[in-house]
Amino acid sequence: MENKKFYITTPIYYPSDNFHIGHCYTTIIADSIARFKRLSGYDTFFLTGTDEHGQKIEKKAKECGVTPKEYVDKIVDNAKDLWASLNISYDKFIRTTDKEHEEVVQKIFKKLYDQGDIYKGEYKGLYCTPCESFWTETQLDENGNCPDCHREVHEVKEEAYFFKLSKYQTWLEEFLESHPDFIEPTSRKNEMINNFIKPGLADLCVSRTSFKWGVPVSFDENHVVYVWIDALSNYISALGYLTDDDTLFKKYWPADLHIVGKEIVRFHTIIWPIMLKALDLPLPKKVFGHGWLVIDGGKISKSLGNYKDPREYINAYGVDAVRYYALREVPFGSDGNFSEEALVTRTNSDLANILGNLVNRTIGMVNKYFDGKVTNTKIYEDIDNDLIDYATSLKENVTTLVDNLELSNAIDKIFDLFRKCNKYIDDVTPWILVKDESKKGRLECILYNLLECIRIGSVLLQAFLPTTAERIFKQINTKETSFDTIEKFGNYESPNTVNTPEVLFARIEK
């Protein structure tokens, strides 16, 4: 079989302050997809990191009385600790202050300049420092402020280098037309085409002289490379592009999936494709722009300061409660409201009631009725068919949903199996069967069916709630945890002895 590869990225986050639940949301989703692909047999590379240059960080560091590098080092250490506490399984964490990255950026800038795609000119425009974005008069909000963060913009005028986006306008339009799935969801694609591309692409300012915290332009020391050529290059610099060792680049590029927030879709679907075209490199297969998590209708953001440390939620409710909420609550692509109350409700209704209760009841019955040991007696009845059919088709159905980036539906599909198991218990009434000695073999088959369904669901759950899946494997005492063990029913060990049940998720009283 052909060696399957999968390269997935989060955006590189801007470490102007500690990360919030919005950063966690993006990263948990990317991590779950990466884990699912690994479990499905893909040679997977999962990249995340930080975009550390720019005027805003230079200014923040000055206010704190430290160098920009000292400032970002502290934030990055905090971010890595947060990712560890969320079980984020990235293969590489790239920083734009890494020497290797800076050298690649300089080479890319020089290459584009040498071939005439970058030229020197003068920039006049309106600049939003918090967003690091330039705007025209017509793009400002009704108060004349930044349309993204609604803060004041400042007029700037300075010598700058420009990237000829306009040269590639027709090519980009034709590319998007011939690759309809490149930008998802469709609403973002339509927004890019109608609001940004069709009105005409202006050449892009790609250097600055008004601050120094950035990658120096190698042939003009007065300039630093402005954010997007620096930041976007991370996806290829992380793989060793234009270095002595480009093994990873040859192996994994082009990326299969860039996951980004909707506010940076335009940079990833206009500037990035044009950069790659100018460098004569293949384009990523898909850019998915997800929605925002909102609090009381407003975006959770560092600049608004309307959030608390995500570790408070992890410490209060457990890592997998936070992961489950992020994956299940909001259909990927839409905006969704974040509330601690909803997190508690989800934890109680789904994790404690549906899953926790099922595992506890099943192991409890095996211990009570069969001293903890169960064998597959294969004394099936018609009532088993629906459950077994659902369980054996689950991998294929969940895989389709993950491939379509329907993460909320994918995890709900797994929980549908657990719901069916709970209903199955109510329908087959083990507590009545146990009173009839002649039904003992049938009762044992029922409990085996339940343990096998719990195993199958948990094998898939590994991608989303890895800690919980491991705890379930331990409690039901199985080593059959790979994806290829769940295509047919009956791979749970037989005979087998279960372990003592433990509470997976305690009900939260609020």
Model-derived regions: residue spans:
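Short, charge-patterned binding micro-sites
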Residues: T50-K56
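Active-site-proximal binding-pocket segments
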Residues: V265, E329, G333, A342, ...
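Basic, alpha-helical terminal appendages of large translation-related enzymes
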Residues: M1-K5, F45, G49, G121-L126, ...
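Structured secondary-structure scaffolds
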Residues: E2-T48, R95, E100-V104, C149, ...
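A broadly conserved sequence feature marking short terminus-proximal activation segments
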Residues: Y71-Y127
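A charged helix-plus-loop insertion that forms the helical arch/lid used to bind
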Residues: K60-D73
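A non-catalytic, amphipathic alpha-helix used as a structural packing/dimerization or gating element
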Residues: S32, E70-D81, K107, I354-R361, ...
